Amino acid sequence: MSYQLIYADPAWQYSNKISNGAAGGHYSTMAVEEMKRLPVSSIADENAVLAMWYTGNFASEAVELAHAWGFKVKTMKGFTWVKLYEQARSRIERALAEQTMIDFEDFMDTLNVETVMNGGNYTRGNTEDVLIAVRGSGLERLNASIKQVVYSCRGEHSEKPAEVRFRLEELYGQVSRIELFSRGEASGWHHWGNENPFNDIELVPASFTTIPPMRNSRVKVLAGHYQALTPLSASKHQISAGIVYLQEVAA
């Protein structure tokens, strides 16, 4: 089965604990090169959309990952999640009931206080973004009123707001869709994740293979829709899908 809409929350591996809150201690993470070897291109429709979460630490890696999966990034700001503290809703509702928040300035002050203060080497982070990338001609936008910014309370570590999934459904309608790196179920979606007991498919990173040098020639690696020409000096070639065909071509 191929999917027209792929929604992914990659398990980024952070090296700076100031910037991420030690993600590896809360859930399984993967190196970028390992995620690139997931055969996502083999499950994507020839015309598909990828909506992928990333943080500012991984902006360039997110673009590389989308490209490795066969997608071209169209915007880095498909959605922006402004994170509120877990108890923000109850505190705001209490302020309204007690009439301690009575005008616009009070509201804006409260909203600013209730946005989280994460780590950061410059300013303190409180947002996370979803890029939009396409394969082929992508998908038709069915609803032109879908907004970018999502205000939502923070949940479990790395848990993303369901509102983004709902907006994607409204944006693209009833297409075949899958959520990658998921940890639960959602109606109308297929799922894959290494911590998800409800997987609908299995994705395994492709391994490396060693190809002996070929005199006066190059090696063309055909994997899915990829077509990578490698230099003679390279002895290892990355496989980006389950089946790889090798073809000798003129130098």
Question: Model-derived features: where do they sit?
Answer:
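Basic/aromatic-rich interaction segments and small domains that mediate binding to polyanionic partners
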Residues: 231-247
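Amphipathic alpha-helical oligomerization segments
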Residues: 215-227
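Polar/charged alpha-helical tracts
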Residues: 106-110, 224, 240
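Class I S-adenosyl-L-methionine-dependent methyltransferase catalytic core
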Residues: 1-218, 249-251
